[in-house]
Amino acid sequence: MLYTVIVLTGMVLAGIAAAFVIELLVVALFPNVSAPGQHLTKGKGLPLKELVPSDRRRDVTFEVEGTSISAWLYLPRGQSSPVPCIVMAHGLGGTKKMLEPYVTRFQDAGMAVLVFDYRYLGESNGEPRQLIWIPYQLQDYAAAVAYARSLKEVDADRVGLWGTSLSGGHVLVTAARDGRIACVSAQCPLLDGLAASEQQLHRLGIRYALRMLGHAQRDLVRSWLGLSPHKIPIVGRTGSLALMSDDDAWDFFAESASDDFVNEACARIAMNIYRYRPVDHLHQVRCPVLLQTCDHDFALPSKVVDKAASRLGAFAEIVRYPIGHFDIYRGSHFETAVNRQIEFFSKHLFPTDSK
């Protein structure tokens, strides 16, 4: 009797496993499956080549596992000795060109800035294009820090990190892994991908979640089989199939996207991001952290901010704003946030007798 039960159980489990494999293959190989495109009419953007004098910015590159990463190094005027440096990159799908408003402000405050594009995005190399994969982006941040420390113009013991949204989580994880980081500024950071996904499910519904899962599975399995990637929009109107399905997100990117921003990403990131929980690393951070959070952030529940504050303890400086996720990039909210960041970096990157 026991033997029969074991055999039947094994057959049932094998059947379930086979059905799952068949489902994945069908999802991956079924022809003519695509996500509706979201054509983004971009604003005028930032005329970077005109606004930034060549003597204030250098084009530099460094490599990660044989792939060249494109970066810009900004140095403060009148530099006579190694200076502190801020290492930074954008959030979900953003490029270094879109961070110019922050970079020039930090540079004017006397700091060097190394801003880079992740592999597969912007002006960096790597195939497939538009691959957003969290472990790779964390490697890129670590490599950028190492490169900054190797520069003769930079004080290797005064390297800080800046991140926003998805990269706001990256800089916290990077600081948890690298005890030499001097300080971290994380703006509207992704702290808990699972909590953010649950909030997204509540806002957009189960149909959206199931459609997103199907597209993510298709791309992931196709990558295992060596097939071309399956892509979905990064940003779309509320209710559309996009990684950021939100009218405010759409309006922000329409206003601010750079000419090298491409509104699509390999769909597999949707299966990677919900497991990403930087909040679980915060107990390992041993440097000052500025957390600027938005009370109406679609990706950051207030309970997660409270958890982050508890785990960071005395290292945390938390500033909450009664605004949405994308408001912090605009107008007076941007000015308030960036001025606080300059104050924070100046305090922790400059010795009291050096500025």
Give short role names for the model-derived ranges.
Residues 39-81, 330-331:
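N-terminal cap/lid segment of alpha/beta-hydrolase-fold proteins
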Residues 95-96, 121-156, 160, 331-337:
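Catalytic nucleophile-loop/oxyanion-hole region of alpha/beta-hydrolase
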Residues 170-255:
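Alpha/beta-hydrolase-fold enzymes
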Residues 298-304:
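Conserved alpha/beta-hydrolase "acid-adjacent" motif
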